[in-house]
């Protein structure tokens, strides 16, 4: 291996730190059944459905306070990985541990520790106000009465949405909906924040504002942990301290951004080299 290539060396599922991980993804495989077409049901009704493997034998450790960018092409398995960590999906094989608890055996407990910010506008009730939406979702987290009202006011102010609290959600811009989605997660005060391509539908100004919001929110508590799926290397550099590359259902590499900076390697260069190495396997 040449000196140049050594700089780009890929270390699959690199484990950083020796303390017990907050999140452990252990030999996880996730398969989804492929729906049969009508003709297949008629001609071969007893034939088993084919399956699609979204993630294969994945291993990853996340320490408390890590801020990790999960990068990869569309369909690589990024969202599947994040949903498995959040407990929204259960693995076909292997296990996911959050705070030492299995997402399969103790799903309710682990989901309380993780807040997932969906990049999906339909996840809100459009004919309710922002505050009414937060009241509904807060009640699902067993918050009620004065405690819930105070928490709603606090998170709305935190995300800069206090003036829009009584406006119907369907009147919100994409950026406002993303801020409301972050507020919804903040209500429950999770240990882990997961964001799935949070700036995908935003214009450049709204992107910068959202990045600043995420940074200020995370930095209010340095022990909070962040995982964010993104296609934007500059976003990964600004928000995160580590980058994990996913491709074709596999975790291909993991590297500290500090290490990359020390070697004069950008996140984009590292990502490209990992993907090139993958194609050469």
Which stretches of residues belong to each language-model region?
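Conserved ABC ATPase "signature" region
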Residues: 135, 139, 146-164
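Catalytic Walker B motif of ABC-type/P-loop ATPase nucleotide-binding domains
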Residues: 193-197
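Helical segment within the ABC ATPase nucleotide-binding domain
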Residues: 208-221
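The feature captures the beta-strand-to-loop junction immediately N-terminal to the Walker
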Residues: 71-73
């Amino acid at each position: 291996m040449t000196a140049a290539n050594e700089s780009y060396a890929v270390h699959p599922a690199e484990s950083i730190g020796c303390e017990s991980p907050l999140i452990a993804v252990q030999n996880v495989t996730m398969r989804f059944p492929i729906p049969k077409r009508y003709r297949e049901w008629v001609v071969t009704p007893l034939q088993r459905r084919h399956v699609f493997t979204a993630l294969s034998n994945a291993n990853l450790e996340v320490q408390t306070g890590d801020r990790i960018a999960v990068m990869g092409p569309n369909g690589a398995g990024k969202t599947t990985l994040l949903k498995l960590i959040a407990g929204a999906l259960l693995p076909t094989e292997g296990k996911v541990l959050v705070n030492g608890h299995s997402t399969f055996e103790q799903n309710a407990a682990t989901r309380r520790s993780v807040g997932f910010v969906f990049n999906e506008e339909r996840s809100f009730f459009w004919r309710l106000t922002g505050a009414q939406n937060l009241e509904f979702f807060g009640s699902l987290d067993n918050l009620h009465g004065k405690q819930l009202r105070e928490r709603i006011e606090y998170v709305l102010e935190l995300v800069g949405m206090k003036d829009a609290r009584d406006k119907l959600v369907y009147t919100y811009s994409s950026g406002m909906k993303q801020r409301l989605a972050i507020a919804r997660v903040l209500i429950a005060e999770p240990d882990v924040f997961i964001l799935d391509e949070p700036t995908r539908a935003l214009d450049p100004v709204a992107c910068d504002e959202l990045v600043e919001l995420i940074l200020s929110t995370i930095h209010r508590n340095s022990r909070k942990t962040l995982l964010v799926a993104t296609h934007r290397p500059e976003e990964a550099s600004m928000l995160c301290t580590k980058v994990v590359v996913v491709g074709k259902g596999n975790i291909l590499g993991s590297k500290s951004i500090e290490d990359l900076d020390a070697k004069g390697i950008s996140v984009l260069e590292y990502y490209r080299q990992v993907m090139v190495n993958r194609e050469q396997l």
